[in-house]
Amino acid sequence: MSFLIDSSIMVTSQVLFFGFGWLFFMRKLFKDYEVRQYVVQVIFSVTFAFSCTMFELIIFEILGVLNSSSRYFHWKLNLCVILLILVFMVPFYIGYFVVSNIRLLHRQKLLFACVLWLTFMYFFWKLGDPFPILSPKHGILSIEQLISRVGVIGVTLMALLSGFGAVNCPYTYMSYFLRNVTDADILALERRLLQTMDMIISKKKRIAVAHRTMFQRGEVHNKPTGFWGMIKSVTTSVAGSENLSLIQQEVDALEELSRQLFLETADLHATKERIEYSKTFQGKYFNFLGYFFSIYCVWKIFMATINIVFDRVGKTDPVTRGIEITVNYLGIQFDVKFWSQHISFILVGIIIVTSIRGLLITLTKFFYAISSSKSSNVIVLLLAQIMGMYFVSSVLLIRMSMPLEYRTIITEVLGELQFNFYHRWFDVIFLVSALSSILFLYLAHKQAPEKHMAL
């Protein structure tokens, strides 16, 4: 009876997560597009529901909600379904919609979709060869074979996003990195943009007048007769077409310049708004957060370097370890086990909420940046694939933030994976991503004033 009650709780929560994913799809991703494939919407919502359910089970594990055997069953079921979606269903439909957009392959789209899926499976399987991610005990058809490969891709994605976010967050929030932009700078750039637009209009008028003149001459005058008349008409038309092509090239160059000027003007307006915002109370608060995240970024890079150099992976969760160090240093009586459980629960909850929120914001921005009416279905499926892999790998990494007694079922469900490898791999990719982001933002910040002065 308790199993039925536990299952009804899980099904209800999954329905709620599915509904939230459906609303997010309708309200955020596809609100500007008329063409909607319901199979894409269902796949995205199901992926979102089962991804969130994994985080829900982590919280249930810490709080002791549901029976232990029920949690184990739903962990196993949830993991099997999410792997089925990520490895078989989503890649196949991505290939199917890619082929559907190619007219030459339209008649045999099912066949070519299968070919693309088999190609994906080949490279997906070969991905596990260079990495020490499995125990030798696992067979070729075991669930660990799939989790291990999905984990490598997901951890790589998480580390890339975390490395960039750790650097970009203080860069975005801190007023120290803002350029000094005045109204005179904006007016000067807008004046140059208007001058460029005037030049484009005048040159397009010249082209239009020339075309009209050539058309009228062809209408009014009879075709030239005689040998010399034909030579004269050919040379005149060639010279005229060359002049028009030169003017058109100038127009193309000016239009490209106008696009750059427009983007630069928008950037200056945004910077000016950020300067004004930084003077408000909320802006000062985010500026303080920027300094805090700067310290956190330096600390994370330092710890990642230490972990890589000394091949170190923590055996104790960070909260328990931090409390033990503080208690020993201060020499006070403190129930480390009791409080570490509660603080770990709060920490894991914050990680889960911020992970879901941050990923959804990133997915929305990414979708708007590259989608179109033809590619939107493929992009949504790619986002579903990224989201699922991201959440599976989050479970692999969050496991280390939990006290040992809460890791048991998660470890049993995930199997005998080489968990230390994933943490070491995360540190390597995080370090590369963070250092690359620092270099990129430094060059962009240094180049921006020079570009502004040149304009």
Swiss-Prot record:
The keyword DNA repair does not apply. It is found in: Golgi apparatus membrane. Homotrimer. One of its GO terms (biological process) is protein transport. It catalyses: iodide(out) = iodide(in); chloride(in) = chloride(out); bromide(in) = bromide(out); fluoride(in) = fluoride(out). It comes from Gallus gallus. One of its GO terms (molecular function) is voltage-gated monoatomic anion channel activity. The chain crosses the membrane at residues 5-25, 46-66, 79-99, 111-131, 150-170, 290-310, 343-363, 378-398, 425-445. It is a multi-pass membrane protein. Keywords: Glycoprotein, Golgi apparatus, Ion channel, Ion transport, Membrane, Protein transport, Transmembrane, Transmembrane helix, Transport, Voltage-gated channel. This is Golgi pH regulator. Belongs to the Golgi pH regulator (TC 1.A.38) family. Voltage-gated channel that enables the transfer of anions such as iodide, chloride, bromide and fluoride which may function in counter-ion conductance and participates in Golgi acidification. The keyword Transmembrane applies. GO terms for cellular component: Golgi cisterna membrane; Golgi membrane; Golgi-associated vesicle membrane; monoatomic ion channel complex. Glycans are attached at N67, N180, N243.
